[in-house]
């Protein structure tokens, strides 16, 4: 969709999903996570790349190059604006906008006094990673140590691969594999200018064992790698310090929307499933023969009308192979659906 929208120079590209947009943290881990009402392309790219699942990182680049806005919308709340991703505003204020995390991170630590000022050492090291088909994510270095992270979402990281890699690396340095780890990333513009405001955050990390710290060259993120076992408990505390307590310069309504907890509280209670009211009837049918697939025509009609109300869809089709019952097809035809038969 992003590529088509970019090629057509569309007014916007809409991504419809099961959540209202991108949040300042994973709302299932941090109920106080705030909706991010507006992001620029680069911020959204960083959030998506460092752990957020709602948006694939590769869908942002074509929209950015074509200057096409990208909207994230909720299928269950079609009138809710969600998250709007577009060009950077000239008056954008520096500040952390999101905290994201990834589990299953593997660290490979390499040290040796011989690496200091040795020409081509890193080339020799990374050639061995390439030999085993491994893509390096984060890098931290000193005069006598280089530590890199491997992201399992981009690599096949198992004990056999790591053993072969360690054996190859042992030819040029001492090797230590540290796992399982998790990365926690603070995302926002102007991270270098915000370091003096992160004292409480640094103190929080100071209570745990931090294996690696990496700051991006584009000044958009600051990443800490810790033991996987402590990461989940740290996220709510970090969010409280940075976002919920409004410690950052950026806190305007144009950036932060309501929290996930507020949105869930305000959401209308879901109606009871139709089958609960007809339980006795269904059990009687089950006595005749099982298994049976049961459709409620009133429920089908209601859902068809909800789909019909989505303005972003030009045409709607029903796959006949799902259930070809004449009454079901008749209802869908009355609601303006076409039919797909394969």
Please provide the spans of the model-predicted regions.
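C-terminal catalytic "cap/lid" subdomain
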Residues: 1-261
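A charged N-terminal "starter" segment
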Residues: 250-342
């Amino acid at each position: 969709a992003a590529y088509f929208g970019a090629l057509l120079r569309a007014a916007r590209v809409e991504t419809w999903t099961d959540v209202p947009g991108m949040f300042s943290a994973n709302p299932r881990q941090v109920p106080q996570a705030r909706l991010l009402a507006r992001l620029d392309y680069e911020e959204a790219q960083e959030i998506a790349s460092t752990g957020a699942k709602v948006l694939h990182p590769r869908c942002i680049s074509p929209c950015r190059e074509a200057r096409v806005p990208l909207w994230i919308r909720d299928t269950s709340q079609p009138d809710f604006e969600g998250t709007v991703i577009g060009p950077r505003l000239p008056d954008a204020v520096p500040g952390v906008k999101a905290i994201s995390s990834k589990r299953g991170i593997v660290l490979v630590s390499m040290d040796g006094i011989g690496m200091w000022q040795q020409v081509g050492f890193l080339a020799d090291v990374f050639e061995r990673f390439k030999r085993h088909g491994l893509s390096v994510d984060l890098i931290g270095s000193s005069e006598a140590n280089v530590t890199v992270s491997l992201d399992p979402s981009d690599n096949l990281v198992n004990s056999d691969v790591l053993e072969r890699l360690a054996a190859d690396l042992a030819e040029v340095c001492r090797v230590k594999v540290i796992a399982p780890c998790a990365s926690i990333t603070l995302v926002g513009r102007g991270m270098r200018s915000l370091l003096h405001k992160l004292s409480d955050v640094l103190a929080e990390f100071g209570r745990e064992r931090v294996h690696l710290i990496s700051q991006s060259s584009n000044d958009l993120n600051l990443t800490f790698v810790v033991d996987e076992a402590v990461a989940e408990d740290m996220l709510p505390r970090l969010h409280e310090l940075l976002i919920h307590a409004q410690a950052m310069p950026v806190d305007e309504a144009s950036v932060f929307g309501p929290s996930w907890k507020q949105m869930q509280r305000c959401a209308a209670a879901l109606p009871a499933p139709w089958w609960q009211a007809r339980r006795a009837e269904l059990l009687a049918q089950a006595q005749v023969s099982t298994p049976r697939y049961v459709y409620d025509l009133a429920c089908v009609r209601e859902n068809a009308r909800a789909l019909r109300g989505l303005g972003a869809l030009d045409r709607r089709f029903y796959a006949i192979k799902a259930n070809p019952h004449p009454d079901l097809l008749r209802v869908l035809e009355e609601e303006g659906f076409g039919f797909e038969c394969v």
